[in-house]
């Protein structure tokens, strides 16, 4: 696990199928905000994105990173400029599409991935990150994220958290 690295999906687009399936398994079939086709389009856009900079201009920038351990995909995590929850679109940018291979959960990979994404965000000059979660609030709070909001929607209940990076 010490060899864990984040690689832009654009550098290894052929490796995106496994994390896409994880995303579909968790969120993509029946989510009223983000359909299976939306997930496929998200990964397609990530495979074509410019990872050299964060433009911060309010465009729908989506940077998807594969977590690799010895050239095996063990997770996926994204930095995005928008969120699918309309009420919170004014908060930017977001940690999104964060999934660890189900067979590798509980091994510290998720913490390493989140730390690596935060470092990339800092390098882009991003000062604060946001995310939402359905049931992992404690995981994020242990890593410095502060609880901001809880919302119960007809389709989903979620917590919004934020973290200062600077």
Regions found by a protein language model. Give the residues of each.
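Active-site rim helix/loop that mediates acceptor-substrate recognition in acyltransferases
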Residues: 23, 27-66
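Conserved beta-strand in the GNAT
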Residues: 62-66, 72-83, 94, 99
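Conserved acetyl-CoA pyrophosphate-binding loop and the N-cap/start of the following alpha-helix
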Residues: 103-104, 108-116
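Conserved active-site alpha-helix within GNAT-family acetyltransferase domains
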Residues: 123, 127, 134-157
């Amino acid at each position: 696990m010490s060899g864990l690295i984040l690689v832009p999906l654009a550098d290894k687009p052929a490796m995106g199928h496994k994390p896409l399936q994880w995303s579909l398994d968790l969120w993509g079939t029946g989510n009223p905000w983000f359909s299976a086709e939306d997930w496929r389009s998200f990964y397609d856009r990530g495979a074509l994105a410019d990872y050299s900079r964060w433009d911060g201009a309010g465009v729908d920038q989506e940077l998807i990173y594969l977590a690799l351990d010895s050239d095996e995909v063990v997770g996926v995590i994204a930095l995005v400029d928008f969120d699918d929850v309309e009420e919170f679109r004014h908060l930017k940018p977001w940690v999104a599409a964060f999934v660890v291979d189900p067979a590798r959960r509980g091994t510290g990979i998720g913490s390493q991935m989140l730390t690596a994404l935060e470092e990339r965000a800092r390098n882009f000059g991003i000062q604060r990150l946001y995310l939402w979660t359905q049931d992992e609030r404690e995981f994020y709070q242990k890593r410095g994220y502060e609880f901001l909001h809880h919302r119960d929607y007809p389709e989903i209940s979620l917590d919004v958290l934020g973290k200062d990076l600077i």
